[in-house]
Amino acid sequence: MKITAIIPARYASTRFPGKALAEIIGKPMVQHVYERTAKAGLVSEVIVATDDERVAEAVRAFGGRVEMTSATHETGTDRLAEVAARIDADIIVNVQGDEPLIEPAMIDEAIAPLVADASIRMGTLKSRIKSLHDFLSPNVVKVVTDREGDALYFSRSPLPNFRDKWNDLKDEAFVTGRLLCYKHVGLYVYRRDFLLAFARMAPTPLELAEKLEQLRVLENGFRIRVVETSFESIGVDTPSDLDKVVEKLSRFQI
């Protein structure tokens, strides 16, 4: 079984232009993501997908594989699908290009269910929400699952919504930890044919309302297996996020 990890990496960014090439301890960010992804035990190969020659040159400079894509894609999924359509692979892993601290074990955790069960078409990760701030923040996507671990819904709103006894339930969740709430970790794994089919599906009402592409999958009646991970990463959306990553890498010499 061939498992290919694709890292979509754009140069343009509204909040942080050029972040894919931002230097972190002597290397561009995209190189950190590439090297850590390559350490995942289940990954056969790693490819950077970009529409910018500056990013492509940086990847070639450290010996990585790069595929050029159209500059007109509206989503990262579309960019991923363009590359997936022209390569030979059984499973495609979408690793965000702004996650320089991603743990290789996280990638393996997300891949494992698709290797073990041929009926699973798509997978992703979740981790425990540990603060009320994150639970209430629309920037933190929440997820609830069924007993098998398949997603029931993703939302920017609090999930679940505590109708009664809010203060008691809040303490259960965020003080005692007996009631678990989860946030979505944006790493996706697809069977190649399902990814290509997903990219052809029209946007759906809930997807457009929440601005969450994965809801398109649920609205079309497909399952997403969600695996809990204990690992934490830091997504780089702003220069201040980059400072946090640099500080952590410097301190622990990761």
UniProtKB/Swiss-Prot annotation:
The keyword Electron transport does not apply. It is found in: Cytoplasm. Its EC number is 2.7.7.38. InterPro entries: Cytidylyl_trans, KdsB, Nucleotide-diphossugar_trans. Its main location: cytoplasm. One of its GO terms (molecular function) is 3-deoxy-manno-octulosonate cytidylyltransferase activity. It comes from the Bacteria. Keywords: Cytoplasm, Lipopolysaccharide biosynthesis, Nucleotidyltransferase, Transferase. Pathway: Nucleotide-sugar biosynthesis; CMP-3-deoxy-D-manno-octulosonate biosynthesis; CMP-3-deoxy-D-manno-octulosonate from 3-deoxy-D-manno-octulosonate and CTP: step 1/1; Bacterial outer membrane biogenesis; lipopolysaccharide biosynthesis. It is an enzyme of class 2 (transferase). Belongs to the KdsB family. Activates KDO (a required 8-carbon sugar) for incorporation into bacterial lipopolysaccharide in Gram-negative bacteria. PANTHER family: 3-DEOXY-MANNO-OCTULOSONATE CYTIDYLYLTRANSFERASE, 3-DEOXY-MANNO-OCTULOSONATE CYTIDYLYLTRANSFERASE, MITOCHONDRIAL. This is 3-deoxy-manno-octulosonate cytidylyltransferase. It comes from Geobacter metallireducens (strain ATCC 53774 / DSM 7210 / GS-15). The lineage of its organism: Bacteria, Pseudomonadati, Thermodesulfobacteriota, Desulfuromonadia, Geobacterales. The gene is kdsB.
